[in-house]
Amino acid sequence: MSDGEEDQTAIVCDNGSGLVKSGFAGDDAPRAVFPSIVGRPRHQGVMVGMGQKDSYVGDEAQSKRGILTLKYPIEHGIITNWDDMEKIWHHTMYNELRVAPEEHPTLLTEAPHNPKANREKMTQIMFETFNVPAMYVAIQAVLSLYASGRTTGIVMDAGDGVSHNVPIYEGYALPHAIARLDLAGRDLTDYLMKILTERGYSFVTTAEREIVRDIKEKLCYVALDFEQEMATAASSTSLEKSYELPDGQVITIGNERFRCPETLFQPSFIGMESAGIHETTYNSIMKCDIDIRKDLYANNVLSGGTTMYPGIADRMQKEITALAPSTMKIKIIAPPERKYSVWIGGSILASLSTFQQMWISKQEYDEAGPSIVHRKCF
């Protein structure tokens, strides 16, 4: 970068499947956090001059959800609708952060084992549509480790679209041992919709799914012992909680509170053949060199919104202790700000002086094209 660009703060944008977290490098929290949603009206507008738009993004889409069809352009961490994604980035830059993207280097994030075309297209849109001076794509779990102040550990990052385990030793990610699981918050929301329907509460539309997501975030928790908790729920009403729907109707939920997140440990609940998050973590550690496993066991870092359930750290501790050698010291680190730790790590990374030579500049992009991203970003 030339001297004239030093005063430009980098933008950090963690575009998750469920929430976009964006802000400026060096800040300790994101300025803007809004749902990664684009909504389109599902009815004909009849009142003239109301300035009705053909699409709404983020919080505005959320507040008008009763008349909109909501779509998430990112599914399982992969961008599936680029036009809508451009709308989201446009909204982030111009409406939320109120910056001119051509003046700020931009750090984006993605899940590991994403299709190569995904980050190439991200790079292309940043340089060609938004004309950013420089950009970089970082792996989400690696940023979470930065945020926790460690250089060694295994990160279990679970968001809305994808969960992944990334073992990192002395700052090096170990790509052969990365485990990715396409089971995350959105699948849990869908499962909760299903089991609430069995109780006689019907949730079907894209807008009602948002209500269920709110129920999930407010009332769900992870049981330490699932069978025992089921027995408790069956024999008493002590675990029941009530929730008021937007129309004033009150619903009661009992064992659904912990049956929903239990799916993380037993994916067979939603018909997936995969191992649970405790097993993927263990398998990931076992794929690493025998000499570094001890350090990974002692530094299990949780990150992402789907690790926010009460009880999840204790349950992880219990499950991994059962799998690991009996003498092994196991520590689960669950930082309170872990919902945003990917963003915080990005903010730290983008403001390091040593990182400044890592950016992909506009000039490099013009010379090499979108594939430059595989050479310059891990």
UniProtKB/Swiss-Prot annotation:
Subcellular location as annotated: Cytoplasm, Cytoskeleton
Any one Gene Ontology cellular component term annotated for this protein: cytoplasm
PROSITE patterns, alphabetized: ACTINS_1, ACTINS_2, ACTINS_ACT_LIKE
EC number(s) per entry: 3.6.4.-
Alphabetized InterPro entries for the sequence: Actin, Actin/actin-like_CS, Actin_CS, ATPase_NBD
GO MF, one example: ATP binding
UniProt keyword annotation of Lipid metabolism present: no
Enzyme class (EC, first level): hydrolase
Keywords: ATP-binding, Cytoplasm, Cytoskeleton, Hydrolase, Muscle protein, Nucleotide-binding
Reactions catalysed: ATP + H2O = ADP + phosphate + H(+)
UniProt cross-references to Pfam families, sorted A to Z: Actin
Main localisation: cytoplasm
Family: Belongs to the actin family.
Function: Actins are highly conserved proteins that are involved in various types of cell motility and are ubiquitously expressed in all eukaryotic cells.
Subunit structure: Polymerization of globular actin (G-actin) leads to a structural filament (F-actin) in the form of a two-stranded helix. Each actin can bind to 4 others.
Name this polypeptide is given: Actin, muscle
